[in-house]
């Protein structure tokens, strides 16, 4: 009865909303309106058929389901009718509709489990627990531990559509395990499986309530069901089984669990889709025109990207290097408002303030006695465990081989001003990340201003997003270790320096004061990169094409003013180079020895040398290996470097080579086309960036694999400038097609929207890929922050 009424009601509602655009436009209802109404009605019922498949759409169909489906039809009708009627009225009309769309998607789709479980009749699964099973039994509670991990339920003989833990708490008293995870293997028998069969696993975050219920898709009545618990375990985190619960409810009606975070994410995604559609004004207005809507879009993009910069470094509490009574409490000293743990740069800052270049810590006598202290096997054989891992060891003392600049910028002044040692890297990386992000906006903006003034606002915004998301920027933020800290500092200074250089090259010579300031600070930033990540200094060659037109082409260098500007450009480079060379010579006896070969790590860096067999696997893995996608969160699988060479390979896991995993970069192949090449060559400086960045990419890949290994974070050495080169190609292609389309060329007019769609799709893919890498890559949020990992997992996989 109710289903028939619902069918009729939804037909009526669909018909009304299908006709609304005709009424608003004062025209007769057309077949197109009828098609919209029919499509709307069909879409709602197809969704209902999928959503109510447990136990079936017609089973338990009552008034609540009638109201739910009618309301969903009304929401979908309102949205479609509104977009059809007001879609071309501009943002003021569309934004409220997009908000309503996001609200409905969160309510009806994100909370589909609330609607499809409303009619369930729950029962307590613990009533069927086998009395012979060894578990901890309290007053109304059951406990599991490492010796008791098995639950068996017998003679259930009724369907089970979901399971929910009631009153689940952790019994683990170890502070490091305050946030932990347990994985239950589910086995049982049902109408289709008379023998015990493994059905799947249930990953439970003890501080992630969304994970404490799971949907089951079993056949018919369940006879027996077993749950076997195992603590999550990886190289970086291991959790024991230690939990207590009051019960396990089967066929539990799910609560309405509205997520503001998911609603905001959906709304922003819809806003981006609307803003980047081919007919959008963002594509038809020049960025340099300064339109208020374009600037507002840039502000939204910047705020979203900056929000992730601020929060990501704190996603892995035990790796942040700081602790309070409420955050990372396992490392809190119990007294300070904020306490910091030992960090290499903190120890270096303390030594520098005490007039020393080495660290104050004394190496163990057993290490000093070894013939080759860099041999990890020899250290293990001598049972020397009390060493400073990844520190340089030279002439019996510990040193920091990582570049000194991050320490000079943050740790040293912090201790000098406050007296507090070991400033954590995470807050420093937040500041550096914001600088890098601002520099991305600035560098791309200068490129548009100088070479592509006709570039659309959408192309500019997509380019900024591509540089930030396509590089390993956010992956560095996720791991606030000294390795990532030094690389991020180098990348931020490099991009800031390039921004200042480009701005200087665009500054009129009449404004000499501003010009000199930009030259000095631009060169200072780029020079300081050598004290962070020396490899990145290869991009200093960009100074030649940037300043060539003015100082060589226009012969300004021959003038007194030009010579003074050249001196301003060179002075910071000379001073920084002299300082770094003195620092190296004072420690290791050579101005060119940064000390990386004296690293106490898992292999003897002093014997590494050059070997050509490393190059092939490194180039393939770093550049061309395809991402390995899977059907479950986080949707990406890590891969290891593969090689047939019988050699010690130093590597970390990858999720695809940068060229294969970043479609935005594929446009770098366009210069192979003669017509595009001619167009690009009209902007010779831009062409130098386009050609130079892939060349540096190859050189750095080879250098990194020979010097250290094949590591994903090393892609950050060149990826920002490489992505900038790709952005220049997109600008060039868009500009060429726009000019030809304006002249009436049909092919160009048809190709331009396609190009823009592909550009937006490439950045969208990159954003999804980067989001997945944050949850897929080591040291694995699944173990470092289970509550965050599993909560996000369930927000994405809402159907579970």
Predicted regions and their residues:
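Perimembrane helix-loop-helix junctions
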Residues: 539-574
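Hydrophobic, aromatic-rich transmembrane alpha-helices
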Residues: 13-25, 644-684, 740
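Membrane-interface alpha helices of multi-pass inner-membrane proteins
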Residues: 495, 517-533, 540-541, 567, ...
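Transmembrane-helix signature of polytopic, membrane-embedded enzymes
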Residues: 28-45, 441-472, 492, 508-517, ...
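Transmembrane-helix motifs of polytopic, lipid-linked glycan transferases
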Residues: 423-453, 496, 500
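Start-transfer (signal-anchor) and selected internal transmembrane alpha helices
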Residues: 3-40, 64-110, 260-343, 458-460, ...
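Specific aromatic-rich, kink-prone transmembrane helix
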Residues: 488-509, 524-526, 540-542, 721-725
């Amino acid at each position: 009865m109710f289903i028939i009424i619902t069918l009729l009601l939804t037909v009526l509602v669909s018909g009304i909303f299908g006709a609304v655009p005709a009424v608003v436009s004062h025209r007769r209802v057309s077949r197109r309106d009828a098609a919209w109404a029919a499509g709307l009605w069909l879409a709602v019922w197809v969704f209902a058929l999928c959503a109510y498949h447990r136990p079936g759409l017609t089973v338990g169909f009552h008034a609540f389901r009638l109201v739910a489906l009618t309301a969903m039809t009304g929401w979908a009708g309102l949205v479609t009718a509104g977009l059809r009627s007001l879609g071309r009225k501009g943002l003021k009309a569309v934004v409220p509709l997009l908000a309503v769309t996001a609200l409905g998607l969160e309510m009806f789709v994100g909370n589909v489990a609330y609607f499809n479980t409303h009619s369930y009749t729950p029962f307590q699964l613990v009533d069927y627990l086998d009395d012979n099973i060894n578990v901890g039994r309290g007053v109304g509670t059951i406990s599991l531990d490492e010796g008791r991990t098995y639950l068996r339920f017998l003679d259930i003989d009724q369907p089970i559509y979901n399971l929910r833990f009631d009153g689940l708490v952790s019994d683990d008293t170890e502070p490091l395990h305050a946030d932990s995870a347990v994985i239950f293997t589910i086995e049982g028998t049902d109408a289709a499986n008379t023998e015990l069969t493994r059905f799947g696993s249930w990953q439970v975050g003890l501080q992630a309530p969304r994970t404490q219920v799971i949907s089951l898709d079993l056949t018919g009545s369940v006879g027996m069901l077993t749950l076997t618990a195992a603590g999550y375990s990886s190289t970086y985190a291991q959790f024991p089984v230690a939990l207590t619960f009051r019960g396990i409810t089967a066929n539990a009606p799910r609560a309405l669990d509205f997520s503001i975070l998911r609603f905001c994410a959906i709304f922003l995604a819809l806003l981006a889709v609307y803003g980047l559609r081919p007919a959008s004004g963002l594509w038809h207005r020049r960025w340099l025109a300064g339109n208020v809507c374009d600037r507002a879009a840039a502000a939204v993009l910047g705020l979203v990207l900056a929000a992730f910069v601020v929060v990501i470094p704190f996603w892995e509490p035990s790796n942040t290097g700081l602790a309070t009574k409420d955050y990372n409490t396992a490392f809190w000293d119990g007294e300070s408002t904020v306490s910091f743990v030992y960090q290499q740069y903190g120890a270096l800052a303390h030594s520098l303030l005490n007039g020393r270049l080495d660290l104050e810590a004394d190496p163990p006598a057993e290490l000093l006695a070894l013939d080759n202290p860099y041999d990890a096997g020899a250290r293990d054989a001598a049972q020397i465990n009390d060493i400073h891992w990844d520190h340089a060891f030279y002439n019996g003392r510990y040193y920091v081989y990582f570049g000194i600049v991050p320490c000079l910028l943050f740790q040293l002044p912090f201790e000098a001003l406050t007296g507090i040692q070991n400033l954590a890297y995470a807050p420093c990386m937040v500041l550096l990340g914001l600088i890098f992000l601002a520099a991305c906006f600035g560098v791309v903006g200068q490129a548009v201003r100088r070479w592509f003034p006709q570039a659309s606002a959408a192309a500019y915004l997509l380019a900024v997003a591509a540089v930030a998301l396509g590089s390993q920027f956010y992956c560095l933020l996720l791991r606030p270790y000294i390795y990532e800290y030094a690389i991020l500092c180098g990348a931020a200074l490099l991009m800031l320096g390039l921004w200042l250089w480009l701005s200087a090259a665009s500054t009129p010579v009449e404004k000499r004061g501003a010009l000199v300031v930009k030259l000095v600070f631009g060169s200072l930033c780029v020079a300081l990169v050598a004290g962070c990540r020396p490899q990145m200094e290869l991009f200093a060659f960009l100074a030649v094409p940037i300043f060539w037109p003015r100082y060589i082409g226009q012969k300004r260098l021959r003038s007194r003013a030009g010579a003074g500007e050249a001196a301003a450009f060179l002075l910071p480079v000379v001073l920084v180079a002299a300082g770094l060379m003195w620092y190296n010579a004072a420690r290791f006896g050579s101005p060119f020895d940064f000390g990386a070969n004296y690293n106490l790590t898992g292999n003897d860096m002093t014997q590494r040398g050059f070997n050509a067999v490393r190059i092939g696997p490194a180039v393939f893995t770093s550049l061309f290996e395809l991402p390995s996608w899977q059907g479950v969160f986080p949707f990406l699988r890590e891969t290891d470097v593969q090689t047939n060479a019988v050699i010690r390979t130093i590597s970390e896991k990858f999720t695809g080579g940068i060229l294969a995993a970043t479609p935005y970069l594929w446009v770098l192949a366009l210069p192979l086309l003669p017509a595009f090449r001619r167009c690009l060559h009209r902007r010779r400086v831009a062409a130098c960036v386009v050609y130079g960045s892939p060349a540096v990419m190859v050189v750095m890949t080879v250098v990194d694999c020979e010097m250290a290994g094949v590591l994903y974070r090393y892609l950050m050495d060149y990826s920002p400038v490489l992505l900038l080169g790709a952005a220049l190609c997109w600008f060039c292609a868009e500009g060429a097609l726009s000019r030809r389309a304006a002249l009436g060329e049909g092919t160009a007019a048809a190709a331009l929207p396609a190009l823009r769609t592909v550009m937006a799709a490439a950045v969208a893919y990159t954003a999804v890929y980067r989001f997945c890498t944050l949850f897929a890559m080591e040291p694995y949020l699944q173990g470092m922050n289970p509550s965050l990992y599993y909560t996000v997992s369930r927000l994405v996989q809402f159907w579970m």
